Swiss-Prot record:
It comes from the Bacteria. Consists of a catalytic RNA component (M1 or rnpB) and a protein subunit. This is Ribonuclease P protein component. GO terms for cellular component: ribonuclease P complex. Belongs to the RnpA family. It catalyses: Endonucleolytic cleavage of RNA, removing 5'-extranucleotides from tRNA precursor. One of its GO terms (biological process) is tRNA 5'-leader removal. InterPro entries: Ribosomal_Su5_D2-typ_SF (IPR020568), Ribsml_uS5_D2-typ_fold_subgr (IPR014721), RNase_P (IPR000100). Pfam families: Ribonuclease_P. RNaseP catalyzes the removal of the 5'-leader sequence from pre-tRNA to produce the mature 5'-terminus. It can also cleave other RNA substrates such as 4.5S RNA. The protein component plays an auxiliary but essential role in vivo by binding to the 5'-leader sequence and broadening the substrate specificity of the ribozyme. Its EC number is 3.1.26.5. Keywords: Endonuclease, Hydrolase, Nuclease, RNA-binding, tRNA processing. It comes from Prochlorococcus marinus (strain MIT 9515). The gene is rnpA. GO terms for molecular function: 3'-tRNA processing endoribonuclease activity; ribonuclease P activity; tRNA binding.
């Protein structure tokens, strides 16, 4: 299941803002960067009506895998897990989430990835237990 367009982070100014103004949560396989949404940055975007929505981007380095097929499979796996659990929780806050996957051999194991993804989601307070 793909992310809805209203939930996608776009634009280099958005990512610069997240890198500078975010809370960071570290795991062995990935890093979460969470920042409160800033509508001033998104004024130039077409989805201006969805400024206060929760937005997410998952960045997977080529260090994880040189093959785009593998990186896209991991990205879709994490997006799917997030959407299934995010829709259950009705208490959405206007945050921006950037997930950076680190290079590791254990990225081939879906269960470890999902387990750490879930751990960081709860650790960051995005979803409740």
């Amino acid at each position: 299941m793909a992310l809805p367009k209203a939930m996608r982070l776009k634009g280099h100014r958005t990512f610069d803002y997240i890198h500078k103004n975010s809370e960071k949560y570290y795991g062995k396989l990935m890093t979460f960067k969470i920042a409160r949404s800033n509508p001033k940055i998104l004024i130039s975007h077409k989805n201006f009506n969805s400024l206060n929505n929760f937005k997410i981007a998952i960045a997977i380095s080529k260090k994880v895998s040189k093959k785009a097929v593998v990186r896209n499979k991991i990205r879709r796996l994490l997006q799917d897990y997030f959407l299934k659990n995010f829709r259950k929780d009705k208490n959405h806050k206007p945050y921006w989430l950037l997930v950076n996957l680190k290079s590791s051999d254990s990225c081939n194991y879906e269960s470890k990835l999902l387990q750490e993804f879930q751990h960081l989601i709860f650790k960051s307070g995005l979803l409740n237990d």
